[in-house]
UniProtKB/Swiss-Prot annotation:
This protein's name: 7-methyl-GTP pyrophosphatase
Catalytic activity: N(7)-methyl-GTP + H2O = N(7)-methyl-GMP + diphosphate + H(+)
An example Gene Ontology CC term for this record: cytoplasm
Organism: Syntrophotalea carbinolica (strain DSM 2380 / NBRC 103641 / GraBd1)
Alphabetically ordered keywords of this record: Cytoplasm, Hydrolase, Nucleotide metabolism
Function description: Nucleoside triphosphate pyrophosphatase that hydrolyzes 7-methyl-GTP (m(7)GTP). May have a dual role in cell division arrest and in preventing the incorporation of modified nucleotides into cellular nucleic acids.
Length: 197
């Protein structure tokens, strides 16, 4: 089986990859992320996921390299990244409370030997409860989600902020859409269940 490389240092993505039971390497992508409000979010995350995967091609010339990127689009259509500070996180959550928002997660699997790429994206919609200032600050103090787009971790205490979650694959929300990844790996001959090609 070809070497599989996860182009990410995210502990959340690594944990999701472990669910598949496949051996894999982890490497930090050599790619500079940029949020551009003028680019449609689905195009942005696909472009950045592919950029992350391809950035490791020289280091791994015969591998399947997985890149993923996520942005959070608030109810007004504005793309939000990770908060810049605790106060930035307070502002994000204050503005999002009581509204529905969408996560866009891009996925790319790059076969560095064949120079072949599969790229796609998945979405997940979240509706936050109405939140008081005290609830927002209590949450941020207890979880400190400054490394997460949207300022919350739904896989942790952030679930208490939610009123509703909607989507086909909850792992999209965490940053690596596993249903789509299993399909992409299958295209390259990697069977999560069964014989490996």
């Amino acid at each position: 089986m070809k070497i599989i490389v996860l182009a990410s240092t995210s502990p959340y993505r690594m944990q999701l990859m472990r669910q598949l039971g496949l051996p894999f390497h982890v490497a930090a992508p050599q790619y500079q992320e940029q949020i551009d409000q003028e680019i449609a979010p689905e195009l942005l995350v696909k472009h950045q996921a592919a950029g992350k995967a391809k950035s490791l091609a020289q280091k791994y010339p015969d591998a399947l390299i997985i890149g993923s990127d996520q942005v959070f689009v608030d109810a007004s259509g504005r793309v939000l990244g990770k908060p810049d500070s605790l106060e930035g996180a307070v502002r994000q959550l204050r503005g999002m409370a009581g509204k529905s928002h969408t996560f866009y997660t891009g996925l790319s699997v790059y076969d560095s030997n064949r120079d072949e790429t599969l790229t796609g994206f998945a979405t997940y919609r979240v509706t936050l409860r109405a939140l008081t200032e005290q609830e927002i600050r209590c949450y941020l103090q207890r979880e400190n989600p400054l490394d997460c787009a949207g300022s919350f971790k739904v896989e942790g205490l952030g679930i208490a902020l939610m009123q509703r979650l909607e989507g086909d694959d909850y792992t999209t929300l965490i940053g690596l859409p596993l249903i789509k990844l299993v399909d992409f790996l299958g295209h390259f001959g990697v069977r999560v269940l069964g014989d490996q090609a």
